[in-house]
C-alpha cells in the first residue's frame, strides 16, 4: 500500500530554492515509494531547501512501513517542526497505529485539533476520523469518559452535521466494544445494530455481538452470532491490515474459544 499524495503546485513558491525542491519532490513520484531512487530525490530536495517540510515527511514514510521507527521519527519530527499543521495529525496517527504510543498520540492529536480549529480530519490511510483515533487512545488508557467524548465528536457530531455517509466503516463497532468493556450491554448492542446497517460483512461485528449476548445469558442467540462470525472469518471477511493488528480485530481461535466456552457451560 502506498499512501497517495497529490502533486504539489510549484507555482505557489516565489523563491528559486523552494521551486527547485518542489520540482524534484514531484519527480520522485516517477519511482516506487521507498526505492533508492525515490529516496535520493527526496534527499536532494531537502539538500536544496532544508525547510521543505513535505520532503522530510515523504522520506520518512518507507522507514515507518519497514519498522525502522527511530529513523522515521528523526525525519518526521523535522516535518512537524517545519509544519505542525498538518504533520502533527500524521505523526499522532502513526504513533497510535504503529507504536501504540497512546499518550504521545493524544499529545500530538490534541495540538493538531487546536491548530485545525477543531475541524475533524481523517487518518493518513483514510480509515478513521482522527477523533475516533483519539477515542481509541483514551480507551486503551482506561479513560472511558474521555473516550466517549471523542466518540461523540467523531460519530454523533459528524452524523448531525454531515450525515451517515461520513461515518467511518468501523466507528460503531469500536464504540460498541468500548461500551461492552464498561458493561453497558444494551447500548453496545444498539451500536452493533447501527454497524450492521452501515456495513455488516466483518466477523468482528458478530463475534462481539455473541460475547455480549452471552454476558446477558442469551446463549442460544450468542451461538447464532458466533457461528456467523466463524463463517465470515472463514471466508476472510474480517478486519486486517498489512502492517499492524487492528483495534478489536479477532481471529478464528478467538471465535472457536468463545463457542466452546458457551457449549461447555
Show the residue positions of the predicted features.
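Terminal, low-structured helical/coil segments at or just beyond the last alpha-helical repeat
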Residues: 9-16, 166, 223-265
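TPR alpha-solenoid repeat register
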Residues: 55, 87-89, 122, 130, ...
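TPR/TPR-like (Sel1-like) alpha-helical repeat modules
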Residues: 80-84, 96, 107-115, 149-156, ...
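Structural motif corresponding to the intra-repeat A-B loop/turn of tetratricopeptide repeats
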Residues: 32, 66, 98-99, 141, ...
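Flexible helix-coil transition and linker loops at the boundaries of alpha-helical arrays
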Residues: 9-13, 43-47, 77-82, 113-127, ...
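N-terminal leader/linker segments that initiate helical-solenoid repeat arrays
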Residues: 4-57, 65-68, 74, 263
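Alpha-helical adaptor scaffolds
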Residues: 136-197
Amino acid at each position: 500500500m502506498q499512501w497517495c499524495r497529490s502533486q504539489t503546485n510549484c507555482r505557489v513558491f516565489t523563491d528559486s530554492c523552494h521551486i527547485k525542491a518542489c520540482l524534484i519532490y514531484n519527480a520522485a513520484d516517477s519511482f516506487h515509494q521507498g526505492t533508492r531512487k525515490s529516496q535520493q530525490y527526496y534527499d536532494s530536495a531537502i539538500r536544496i531547501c532544508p525547510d521543505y517540510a513535505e520532503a522530510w515527511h515523504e522520506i520518512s514514510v518507507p522507514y515507518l512501513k519497514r519498522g525502522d521507527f527511530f529513523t522515521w521519527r528523526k525525519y518526521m519530527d523535522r516535518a512537524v517542526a517545519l509544519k505542525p499543521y498538518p504533520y502533527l495529525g500524521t505523526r499522532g496517527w502513526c504513533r497510535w497505529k504503529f507504536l501504540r504510543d497512546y499518550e504521545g498520540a493524544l499529545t500530538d492529536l490534541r495540538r493538531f485539533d487546536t491548530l485545525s480549529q477543531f475541524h475533524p480530519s481523517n487518518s493518513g490511510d483514510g480509515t478513521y476520523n482522527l477523533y475516533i483515533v483519539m477515542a481509541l487512545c483514551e480507551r486503551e488508557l482506561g479513560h472511558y469518559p474521555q473516550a466517549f467524548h471523542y466518540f461523540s465528536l467523531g460519530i454523533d457530531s459528524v452524523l448531525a452535521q454531515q450525515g451517515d455517509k461520513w461515518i467511518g466503516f468501523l466507528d460503531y463497532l469500536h464504540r460498541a466494544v468500548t461500551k461492552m468493556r464498561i458493561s453497558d450491554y444494551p447500548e453496545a448492542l444498539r451500536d452493533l445494530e447501527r454497524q450492521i446497517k452501515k456495513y455488516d460483512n466483518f466477523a468482528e461485528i458478530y463475534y462481539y455481538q455473541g460475547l455480549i449476548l452471552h454476558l446477558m445469558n442469551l446463549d442460544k442467540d450468542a451461538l447464532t452470532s458466533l457461528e456467523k462470525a466463524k463463517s465470515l472469518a472463514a471466508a476472510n471477511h474480517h478486519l486486517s491490515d498489512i502492517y499492524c493488528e487492528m483495534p478489536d480485530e479477532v481471529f478464528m481461535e478467538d471465535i472457536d474459544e468463545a463457542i466452546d466456552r458457551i457449549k461447555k457451560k
